[in-house]
Swiss-Prot record:
Entry cofactors: Mn(2+); Mg(2+)
Cofactor binding mode and count: Manganese or magnesium. Binds 1 divalent metal ion per monomer in the absence of substrate. May bind a second metal ion after substrate binding.
EC numbers on record: 3.1.26.4
Effect of H132A: Reduces activity by 75%
Effect of E8A: Reduces activity by 99%
Domain RNase H type-2 residue range list: 1-210
Protein name: Ribonuclease HII
Alphabetized UniProt keyword annotations: Cobalt, Cytoplasm, Endonuclease, Hydrolase, Magnesium, Metal-binding, Nuclease
Pfam families found in the cross-reference section: RNase_HII
InterPro entries linked: RNase_H2_suA (IPR004649), RNase_HII/HIII (IPR001352), RNase_HII/HIII_dom (IPR024567), RNase_HII_arc (IPR020787), RNase_HII_hlx-loop-hlx_cap_dom (IPR023160), RNaseH-like_sf (IPR012337), RNaseH_sf (IPR036397)
Organism (species): Thermococcus kodakarensis (strain ATCC BAA-918 / JCM 12380 / KOD1)
């Protein structure tokens, strides 16, 4: 029997791609994944994730990594959950080795609904099990999580080569916010690596525009008093 796991990395960032990884392994090879001690990618160091990446590939029967650029995410129709279900299905439908059972990390608060909606979009028959924190429960989902996270990390590193320090890309990262504020202040717009429509961008733009107006008012006052 063939078992699949699927997970994403980069759902919440304002910068960079979302990456979805779907993996397939024979049930007889599951102990090999367990021997690698795969687990939720967020609980592993970048160095450990990189090492596991190639080791995981050696155990798999098949895998697909889908990289969704920020412009596609920002211009999507529907909710982020719907977008994720559609692209989970796209990744799974692209597998050459079709699984009999799929374990997925549920993006929906309703696990059964997520499993049902994912199953309805598949072009093959398979049992779908969706759980919250599936990457902590099922090694096959942990493996998918690691492939997705490493791929996103590599993409972010490439962006840093072009744009400098952008942080992790998450709105809560002060480095990311500083980069976006400075870029908007200098260019009057955000770089093409952001996800348009994110509330963070609106807040930053409003903050910078407010600061510019305050600076202009102060400059006007300074000129007036110099004349006086």
């Amino acid at each position: 029997m063939k078992i699949a796991g699927i997970d994403e990395a980069g759902r919440g960032p304002v910068i960079g791609p979302m990456v979805i990884a779907a993996v397939v392994v024979d049930e007889n090879s599951l102990p090999k994944l367990e021997e690698l001690k795969v687990r939720d990618s967020k609980k592993l160091t970048p160095k450990r994730r990189e090492k596991l990446f190639n080791e995981i590939l050696g155990v798999l029967d098949d895998y697909v990594i889908l990289e969704l650029p920020p412009d596609v995410i920002g211009s999507r129709e529907g909710t982020l959950n719907e977008f994720e279900v559609e692209n989970f299905a796209k990744a799974l439908n692209s597998l050459k080795v079709k699984p009999d059972v799929i374990y997925a990390d549920a993006a929906d608060v309703d696990e059964e609904r997520f499993a049902r909606e994912l199953g309805e979009r598949l072009n093959f028959e398979a049992e779908v099990v969706a759980k919250h924190k599936a990457d902590d429960i099922f090694p096959v989902v942990s493996a998918a999580s690691i492939l997705a996270k490493v791929t996103r990390d590599r993409a972010v590193e490439k962006l840093k080569e072009e744009y400098g320090e952008i942080g992790s890309g998450y709105p809560s990262d002060p480095r990311t916010r500083a980069f976006l504020e400075n870029y908007y202040r200098e260019h009057g717009e955000f770089p093409p690596i952001v996800r348009k429509g994110w509330k963070t961008l609106k807040k930053i733009a409003e903050k910078v525009e407010s600061e510019k107006k305050a600076e202009e008012r102060q400059a006007t006052l300074d000129r007036y008093f110099r004349k006086v």
